[in-house]
């Protein structure tokens, strides 16, 4: 079975469910982690869960396919959408579906959606302009869903890290810009307890792509996890590790659905393009 096919994605989810993992959205995680009573703490320690996070960087129609697989298995996930103008293939999906139609379809399947923000990059590092841009597009996505979580888009070729928006401050109030003032309850890179939650991402079209990732990595923890042997390259290796009980109890898995396809031509194209991107990112990381 080909890696990064929809078939092996289903097999990955089946392996997790067979081992007793609960598959949850990022909002589910945040809401549970906010509860601090003793019963909740004990349950959280014992419960096995995987946060399913999808970054919709391109080909949003692919995200609808993974969302349908998850729905058929009775699970929920979170889909973070970039604004349509910068999403490759963002204006049209399968059977001519428009970008808004794809978003609505994923919401209808019971999944969470959020804003995959890159406002610092799009606004050339102008913090004040980026804050206004962020608020505008947050409201855009709230047309389709009551967005409560957001996630930074890495934009590896940009010199600006969009998480730096939260280091900027409002000249009128003298306070830092704060997404929580807008009803946002969580951002995966900023509001996840990575001392408790192990992070896996398919960045680079593999599961150890953090080595060439510019921003989709967890500094301070990545090296520690690697020393513990929590390092797998292919989805086949990851599934084997799950079956052997080697995966930690609490995990966040991030995928980029444009990489997952059963279409042979699209599969090979993605493989070649991603290999080229990895070379470029490797040069950027140094």
Language-model regions, residue ranges each:
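Terminal accessory/targeting
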Residues: 1-53, 57-97, 104, 108-109, ...
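Beta-strand-loop-alpha-helix segment that lines the small-molecule cofactor/substrate pocket
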Residues: 112, 116
């Amino acid at each position: 079975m080909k890696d990064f096919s929809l078939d092996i994605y289903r097999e990955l989810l089946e392996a997790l469910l067979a081992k007793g993992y609960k598959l949850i959205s990022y909002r589910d995680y945040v809401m549970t982690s906010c509860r601090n009573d003793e019963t909740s703490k004990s349950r959280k320690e014992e419960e096995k869960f995987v946060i399913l996070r999808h970054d919709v960087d391109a080909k949003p129609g692919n995200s609808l396919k993974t969302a349908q697989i998850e729905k058929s298995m009775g699970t929920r996930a979170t889909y973070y959408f970039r604004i349509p103008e910068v999403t490759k293939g963002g204006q049209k999906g399968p059977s001519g579906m428009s970008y808004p139609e794809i978003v609505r379809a994923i919401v209808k399947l019971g999944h969470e959606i959020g804003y995959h923000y890159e406002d610092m990059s799009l606004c050339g590092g102008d913090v004040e302009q980026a804050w206004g841009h962020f608020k505008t597009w947050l409201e855009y996505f709230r047309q389709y869903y009551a967005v409560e979580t957001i996630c930074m888009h890495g934009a590896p070729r940009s010199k600006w890290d969009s998480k730096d928006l939260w280091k900027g401050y409002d000249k009128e109030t003298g306070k830092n810009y704060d997404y929580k003032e807008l009803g946002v309850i969580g951002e995966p890179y900023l509001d996840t307890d990575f001392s408790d939650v192990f992070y896996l991402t398919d960045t680079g079209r593999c599961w150890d792509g953090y080595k060439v990732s510019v921003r989709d990595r967890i500094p301070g923890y990545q090296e520690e996890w690697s020393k513990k042997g929590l390092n797998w390259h292919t989805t086949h290796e990851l599934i084997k590790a799950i079956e052997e009980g080697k995966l930690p109890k609490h995990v966040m898995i991030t995928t980029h659905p444009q990489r997952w396809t059963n279409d042979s031509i699209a599969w090979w194209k993605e493989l070649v393009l991603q290999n080229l991107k990895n070379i470029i990112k490797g040069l950027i990381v140094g």
